[in-house]
C-alpha cells in the first residue's frame, strides 16, 4: 500500500508484489525487477472493484507482468483475450501474463512456455468462443471438451 511498505517486504526477501493498490508501488516493484501480480478479474471487470489501481493499463505499460485468477479462475483466459483486444499487447504477450510470467515468478522453469525439454502443458483454445477445447499436461491429453471429442469420431 506504500513504497515504504514494499521496501520492508523487499528487505525480508519478498520478490513478488501482489495486488499493489497504487501505480507507484507497482512501478517501484518493477524497477526492483520484482514480479507484480494483479487479478485477472480486474481486467475482465474493467478495473478494481475496490477503486484501487486498474490492472490492464498497468500491464500495458509493463508495470504488471502477472495476472492471477484471484476469486474467479475463468477470468485468466478471458483477461488475456481482453488485453490482446485492447490493441497494445499481441496475444502471445497477453497470454504470457497468465502463463510464462507466473511460472517464472514462482521459479517453475519447466513450464509456462512451449519449448523442447519443458513439461508440455498446453491449453488448446477456441479463440472465437474463448473457450478451452483440450488440455495437455506433461504432453499427454488430460481433458477434452465434449464437442471436440465428438469431432474426433
Residue ranges and their predicted role:
Residues 32-42, 46-125:
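His/Asp/Glu-enriched, well-ordered alpha-helical/loop segment
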Residues 25, 75-76, 131:
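Short phosphate-engaging motifs
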Residues 114-153:
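C-terminal cap of metal-dependent C-N hydrolases
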Residues 1, 19-20, 39-41, 71, ...:
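Fold-independent oxyanion-binding glycine-rich loops
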Residues 9, 19, 71-72, 81, ...:
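Phenylalanine-focused residue identity feature
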Amino acid at each position: 500500500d506504500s513504497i515504504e511498505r514494499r521496501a520492508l517486504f523487499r528487505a525480508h526477501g519478498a520478490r513478488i508484489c501482489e495486488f499493489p493498490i497504487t501505480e507507484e508501488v507497482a512501478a517501484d516493484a518493477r524497477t526492483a525487477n520484482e514480479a507484480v501480480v494483479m487479478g485477472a478479474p480486474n481486467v475482465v471487470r474493467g478495473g478494481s472493484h475496490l477503486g484501487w489501481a486498474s490492472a490492464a493499463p498497468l500491464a500495458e505499460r509493463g508495470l504488471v507482468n502477472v495476472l492471477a485468477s484471484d476469486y474467479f479462475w475463468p477470468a485468466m483466459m478471458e483477461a488475456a483475450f481482453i488485453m490482446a483486444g485492447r490493441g497494445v499487447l499481441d496475444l502471445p504477450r497477453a497470454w504470457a501474463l497468465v502463463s510464462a510470467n507466473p511460472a517464472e515468478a514462482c521459479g517453475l522453469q519447466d513450464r509456462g512456455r512451449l519449448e523442447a525439454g519443458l513439461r508440455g502443458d498446453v491449453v488448446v483454445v477456441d479463440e472465437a468462443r474463448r473457450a478451452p477445447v483440450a488440455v495437455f499436461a506433461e504432453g499427454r491429453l488430460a481433458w477434452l471438451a465434449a464437442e471436440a471429442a465428438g469431432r474426433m469420431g
